[in-house]
């Protein structure tokens, strides 16, 4: 009898969601098995959350050949990990290697996807998925365009981040970890994912100028690099703090005056805490979940470049309280993705 639920995490966001799913199902006495890729803070978040995992594979890099090699290598390693286990379903956020292995072994894949702009990842996962779970903000036609079967799509009125943000309580210890004083103004920053398949050109070369501008206003910057070369450049700027280890980033956002990120997750998390959050995304493509949160009243903003965002950044630095929002009521109105995940597991016979 297949009775184990397999979770696979590729990114820090996915580690957060996997942690929420793991805790939910383990509390009900279910068997849960977690695999995770070595990338950014993915493994460290699982460790901070107390989630046992098997590290499998690494990030592929910038070139198509490197990505393909990493995909194939990780698929083989995942096969070795799961082939002898009694797995009833895979849950992932569009993990190409994991979904391919699950499909080959006849394991139903339940795939979450809120990034239809990530074309390659979507095409590699959605056609092979038994269930596709997505926020209602993402048009069904976008998922179908990527190969999802219409009857497989299950949408919910919320965003993925609700799973771990709704009950989150900030811990001021994170300030001590970075030698920041209570009430000391700082901005949290993270650069874009320059090596992502959906970004064909380098983006965000003026990030150093922006950090220098912020610290010139006597506001510190806590910078989370994606790659080693970004770390070394940021550490040369006085007033910029580059964490040396994984920490409670969500608590950190709670005490910041603003978040500036080249990704979507950090901006959504920050805005759900009521902190003004700027997402920088260079493509002419809608960010459906960000737009959804903005329409709901969360303080999330989107620009194509740092220079385009500079006027708003300057205004927020002048008066951060003016842009902060009490979001507790707004957050409680959003649906938790754990609900459609549970119903999907029941549908594939995993919770019967």
What are these regions (language model features)?
Residues 26-70:
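Conserved nucleotide-sugar phosphate-binding/catalytic loop shared by glycosyltransferases and other
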Residues 49-62, 211-243:
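Catalytic donor nucleotide-activated moiety binding site of glycosyltransferases and closely related
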Residues 74-81, 228-266:
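Donor nucleotide-activated moiety binding/catalytic core segment of transferases
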Residues 90-101, 111, 252-289:
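A donor-sugar binding/catalytic signature common to diverse glycosyltransferases
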Residues 110-111, 122-134, 253:
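A conserved, positively charged/aromatic
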Residues 133-202:
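A nucleotide-sugar donor-handling region in carbohydrate enzymes
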Residues 272-317:
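Catalytic binding pocket for nucleotide-activated donors in carbohydrate/polymer assembly enzymes
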Residues 320-352:
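C-terminal amphipathic helix plus adjacent low-complexity
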């Amino acid at each position: 009898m297949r009775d184990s639920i397999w979770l696979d995490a590729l990114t820090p966001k996915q580690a957060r969601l996997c942690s929420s799913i793991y805790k939910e199902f383990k509390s009900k006495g279910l068997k849960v098995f977690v695999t995770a890729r070595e990338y950014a803070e993915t493994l460290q978040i699982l460790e901070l959350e107390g989630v046992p995992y098997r590290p499998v594979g690494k990030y592929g890099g910038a070139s198509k050949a490197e990505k393909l090699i990493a995909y194939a290598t990780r698929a083989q390693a995942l096969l070795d990990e799961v082939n002898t286990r009694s797995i009833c379903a895979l849950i992932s956020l569009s993990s190409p290697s994991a979904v391919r292995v699950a499909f080959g072994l006849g394991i139903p894949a339940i795939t979450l996807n809120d990034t239809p702009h990530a074309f390659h990842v979507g095409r590699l996962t959605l056609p092979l998925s038994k269930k596709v779970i997505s926020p209602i903000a993402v048009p069904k036609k976008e998922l179908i365009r990527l190969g999802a079967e219409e009857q497989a799509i299950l949408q919910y009125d919320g965003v993925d981040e609700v799973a771990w943000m709704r009950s989150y309580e900030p811990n001021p210890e994170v300030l001590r970890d970075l030698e920041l004083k209570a009430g000391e103004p700082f901005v949290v920053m993270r650069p874009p994912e320059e090596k992502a398949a959906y970004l064909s050109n380098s983006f965000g070369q003026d990030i150093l100028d922006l950090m220098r501008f912020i610290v010139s206003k006597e506001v510190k910057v806590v910078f989370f690099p994606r790659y080693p070369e970004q770390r070394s450049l940021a550490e040369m700027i006085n007033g910029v703090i580059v964490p040396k280890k994984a920490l409670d980033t969500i608590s950190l956002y709670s005490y910041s005056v603003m978040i500036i990120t080249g990704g979507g997750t950090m901006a959504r998390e920050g805005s759900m805490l009521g902190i003004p959050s700027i997402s920088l995304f260079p493509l002419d493509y809608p960010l459906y979940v960000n737009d959804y949160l903005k329409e709901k009243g969360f303080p999330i903003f989107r620009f194509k470049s740092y220079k385009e965002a500079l006027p708003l950044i300057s205004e927020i630095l002048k008066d951060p309280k003016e842009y902060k929002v009490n979001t507790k009521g707004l957050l409680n109105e959003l649906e938790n993705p754990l609900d459609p995940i549970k119903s999907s597991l029941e549908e594939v016979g995993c919770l019967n």
